[in-house]
């Protein structure tokens, strides 16, 4: 009986995702990946560099523990808290 209970406990632990982590799109590959433990916020950061006029804004996608704050003017950061919510921006 103890063996059966132990087996059920092990199967339950293996089947349940006890350490759920957020999934976000990550650059440069723009693919969905699990975020490291403790990072439950997805973000999209956009900014202009020297090629902004011809190529458009640069984009950085990733995970964070809290929503990052821009360190310079001209950097836009959008945060969200659902799986894969930080899709690559669609430009007009």
Swiss-Prot record:
GO cellular component assignments: extracellular region
CDD domains per record: TFP_snake_toxin
Gene3D superfamilies xrefs: CD59 (2.10.60.10)
Gene Ontology MF terms in the entry: acetylcholine receptor inhibitor activity; ion channel regulator activity; toxin activity
Annotated keywords: Acetylcholine receptor inhibiting toxin, Disulfide bond, Ion channel impairing toxin, Neurotoxin, Postsynaptic neurotoxin, Secreted, Signal, Toxin
Keyword Phosphoprotein: no
PROSITE patterns recorded: SNAKE_TOXIN
Subcellular location as annotated: Secreted
Signal peptide as annotated in the record: 1-21
Disulphide bonds in the chain: 24-42, 35-63, 48-52, 67-79, 80-85
Expression sites (tissue/organ): Expressed by the venom gland.
The protein's role, per its UniProt record: Binds with high affinity to muscular (alpha-1/CHRNA1) and neuronal (alpha-7/CHRNA7) nicotinic acetylcholine receptor (nAChR) and inhibits acetylcholine from binding to the receptor, thereby impairing neuromuscular and neuronal transmission.
Family: Belongs to the three-finger toxin family. Long-chain subfamily. Type II alpha-neurotoxin sub-subfamily.
Name of the protein in question: Long neurotoxin 3FTx-Oxy1
The organism's taxonomic lineage, starting at the top: Eukaryota, Metazoa, Chordata, Craniata, Vertebrata
């Amino acid at each position: 009986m103890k063996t059966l209970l132990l087996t059920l406990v092990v199967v339950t632990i293996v089947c349940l995702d006890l350490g759920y982590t957020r999934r976000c799109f990550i650059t440069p590959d723009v693919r969905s990946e699990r975020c490291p433990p403790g990072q439950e916020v997805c973000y999209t950061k956009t900014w202009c560099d020297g090629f902004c006029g011809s190529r458009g804004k640069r984009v950085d996608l990733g995970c964070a523990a809290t929503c990052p704050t821009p360190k310079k003017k001209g950097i836009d950061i959008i945060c969200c808290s659902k799986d894969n919510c930080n899709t690559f921006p669609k430009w007009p």
